[in-house]
């Protein structure tokens, strides 16, 4: 009743029906804008469950602003509360009551009615109960009381709409809340394929047999259609109005298709892209167990383990094991400790290479908070922030600090090579600011390499996604086709000592029986090609060694011949280093050489005393010489001094000269040989005395 301070006080039994009527009003007035279906009432047990939920999440005001006092004792629950459909309806009722709490309290005070409620959608008609529905006396009593005050309630609602200049009660809500409801009405359903139990092609064929058609986009389509997600190959998209039809088919009953928000699929696919065959994964704050199962199924063909921390209650073990068994997950290991309490050197986590923290966040990127709470097991406090369209600065600071602590702790695991950080928030304080702060304050004392920001590993499917990812962060803004999310990948270079070759990976897989039917003994075409090239290189190296020996022998002969002809002291023969350089270049050149600026352009036969031997060598090569493919090469010999003058005199009068030789035979025996420049001069006869041409001093006027 009303007390001296003008406050209203009511019990929890009345509170239940208040929430019911409030929800009906919200759905009725807002159905044209948000697209919500018209509802004619719910079972009594749904009202009771919604009252208990509302009691825990309602907005408490200061003592000076309190208009209505709410009860503190929860109502007794019923067996139907375990049913998921009842839970969804109850959360929807409670969330609607929370959004309209201020308006309803104003209407209740203005109409002078004792219980806190609103106008029903049935226009004050009696609610019809089904035959198999059990009625609750407290709910019936409150409903009768509301019907008796219908005129006063209608007048109070009209005055409230005039005061706010609103067409309906829906338009009194903040604009952010209205946009959120509009997105939620068109948001499609996302479901990932359990590839341990069924292949994507089998799912497509099964759906087609049931009348579903595969399309590129399901937006604004009322038929039975589905599409494949562009970011995750194992995720299907369905229109939201098909959920009641889909949950009753065998694909969902047998855990072959699992409904889940797309942001979680993006996170596990990012982790999968960073894994090797035998790398383990550590997951933090997973929320829904479907996220763990999805990660396990993606790594089913590997030898990886999926560690999940923070499961403190052992009572959940039987249910979890049953769930994972039904889904075909075999590589999941649950840790009892919270993530912050796990040491970075824990012996169980020495093979963990990728850590996936999914910290608790504001979730302001989520369009349908009720579905998110039910699917991801979030706290009901999640609804309080969404009902107001924002979050307080103090609470945002607390969440950001928790996220920073989890991220920095993940970066302390020295064996880990990557951290995938994911939230469902659109607040920079929870996303970019946390990641940049963690990178800035890394522990420089560790000998391991530091983390750095890496670009997204997911495909960027539109120009907008490319623009949003220019700073190496993957973002998805809330829209009519998806919830908002944030994804960041931190990596560091792998330790070179831990680098594993492809052959080692295949050998491990074969030892564990993962490559049944695949012959590893057969070398691939690429390996054969490499072996062939190595063999040819070996043969070429052997041939080059033989050529080097022949060139060295030739140079020795030329040096001895020059020593016998000249009486002056000449320099030693070509050093071994030059010989090696000549051999490394392959063969002597057969074509005309570029003239050296300090040497006259005429051919020199440096061994005139043995012309017959040289002719025989070039005209009739040995069989093994024919097998060698000769290549042109330039040979530089040491300076040759004239016998009629001293070396000092020559050095003082002329620059250092070098001889450039071609391997050609003399003209009498090889008529096809190129003529020497000295013989090509007009009117000059060839000279048979090769020695005289060798000893002739250079003619500077040529």
Swiss-Prot record:
Give all cystine bridges in this chain. none
- Which spans does this entry mark as compositional bias, Basic residues? 523-534
Record's keyword annotation contains S-adenosyl-L-methionine: yes
- Which EC number(s) does the record attach to this protein? 2.1.1.-
BP term (GO), one: RNA methylation
Spell out the residue ranges making up region: Disordered: 522-541, 567-593, 675-702
Feature: compositional bias, Basic and acidic residues: 681-691
Its protein name is Putative methyltransferase NSUN7
List the taxonomic lineage: Eukaryota, Metazoa, Chordata, Craniata, Vertebrata
């Amino acid at each position: 009743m009303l007390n001296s301070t003008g406050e209203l006080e009511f019990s929890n039994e009345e509170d239940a029906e208040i929430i019911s009527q409030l929800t009906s009003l919200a759905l009725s007035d807002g159905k044209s804008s948000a697209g919500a279906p018209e509802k004619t009432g719910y079972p009594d047990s749904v009202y009771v469950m919604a009252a208990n939920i509302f009691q825990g999440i309602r907005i408490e005001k200061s003592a000076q602003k309190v208009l209505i006092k709410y009860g503190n004792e929860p109502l007794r629950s019923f067996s139907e509360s375990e049913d998921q459909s009842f839970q969804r309806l109850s959360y929807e009722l409670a969330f609607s009551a929370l959004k309209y709490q201020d308006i309803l309290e104003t209407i209740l005070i203005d109409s002078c009615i004792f219980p806190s409620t609103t106008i029903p959608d049935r226009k004050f008609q009696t609610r019809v109960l089904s035959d198999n529905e059990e009625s609750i006396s407290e709910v019936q009593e409150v409903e009768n009381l509301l019907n008796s005050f219908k005129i006063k309630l209608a007048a109070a609602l009209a005055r409230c709409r005039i005061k706010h200049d609103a067409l309906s009660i829906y338009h009194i809500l903040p604009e952010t809340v209205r946009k959120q409801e509009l997105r939620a009405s068109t948001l499609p359903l996302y479901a990932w394929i359990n590839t341990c139990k069924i292949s994507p092609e089998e799912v497509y064929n099964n759906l087609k047999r049931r009348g579903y058609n595969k399309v590129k986009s399901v937006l604004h389509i009322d038929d039975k259609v589905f599409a494949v997600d562009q970011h995750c190959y194992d995720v299907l998209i369905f229109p939201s109005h098909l959920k009641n039809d889909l949950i009753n088919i065998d694909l969902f009953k047998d855990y072959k298709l699992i409904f889940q928000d797309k942001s979680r699929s993006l996170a596990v696919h990012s982790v999968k892209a960073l894994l090797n065959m035998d790398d383990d994964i550590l997951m933090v704050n997973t929320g829904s167990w479907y996220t763990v199962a999805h990660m396990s199924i993606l790594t089913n063909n590997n030898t990886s383990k999926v560690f999940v921390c923070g499961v403190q209650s052992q009572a959940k073990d039987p249910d979890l094991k049953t769930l994972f068994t039904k889904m075909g997950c075999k590589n999941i290991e649950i840790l009892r400790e919270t993530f912050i309490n796990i040491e970075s050197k824990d012996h169980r986590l020495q093979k963990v290479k990728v850590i996936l923290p999914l910290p608790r966040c504001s979730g302001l990127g989520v369009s349908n908070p009720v579905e998110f709470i039910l699917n991801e097991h979030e706290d009901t406090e999640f609804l309080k922030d969404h009902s107001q369209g924002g979050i307080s600065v103090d609470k945002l600071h607390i969440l950001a600090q928790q996220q920073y602590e989890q991220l920095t702790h993940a970066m302390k695991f020295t064996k880990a090579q990557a951290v995938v950080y994911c939230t469902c928030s659109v607040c920079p304080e929870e996303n970019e600011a946390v990641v940049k702060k963690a990178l800035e304050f890394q522990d420089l004392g560790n000998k391991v390499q530091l983390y750095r920001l890496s670009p997204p590993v997911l495909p960027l499917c539109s120009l907008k996604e490319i623009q949003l990812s220019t700073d190496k962060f993957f973002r998805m803004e809330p829209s009519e086709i998806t919830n908002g999310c944030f994804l960041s990948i931190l990596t560091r270079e792998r330790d070179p000592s831990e680098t594993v070759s492809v052959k080692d990976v295949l050998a491990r897989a074969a030892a564990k029986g993962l490559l049944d039917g695949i012959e590893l003994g057969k070398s691939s075409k690429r390996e054969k090609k490499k072996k062939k090239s190595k063999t040819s290189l070996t043969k070429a190296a052997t041939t080059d060694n033989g050529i080097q020996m022949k060139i060295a022998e030739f140079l020795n002969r030329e040096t001895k011949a020059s020593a016998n002809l000249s009486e002056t002291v000449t320099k030693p023969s070509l050093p071994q280093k030059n010989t090696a350089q000549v051999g490394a270049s392959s063969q002597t050149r057969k074509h005309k050489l570029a003239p050296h600026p300090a040497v006259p352009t005429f051919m020199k036969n440096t061994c005139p005393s043995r012309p017959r031997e040289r002719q025989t060598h070039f005209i009739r090569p040995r069989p093994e010489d024919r097998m060698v493919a000769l290549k042109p090469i330039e040979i530089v010999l040491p300076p040759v001094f004239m016998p009629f003058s001293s070396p000092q005199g020559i050095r003082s009068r002329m620059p250092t000269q070098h001889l450039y030789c071609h391997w050609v035979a003399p003209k009498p025996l090889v008529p096809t040989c190129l003529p020497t420049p000295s013989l090509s001069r007009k009117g000059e006869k060839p000279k048979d005395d090769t020695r005289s041409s060798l000893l002739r001093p250079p003619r500077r006027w040529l």
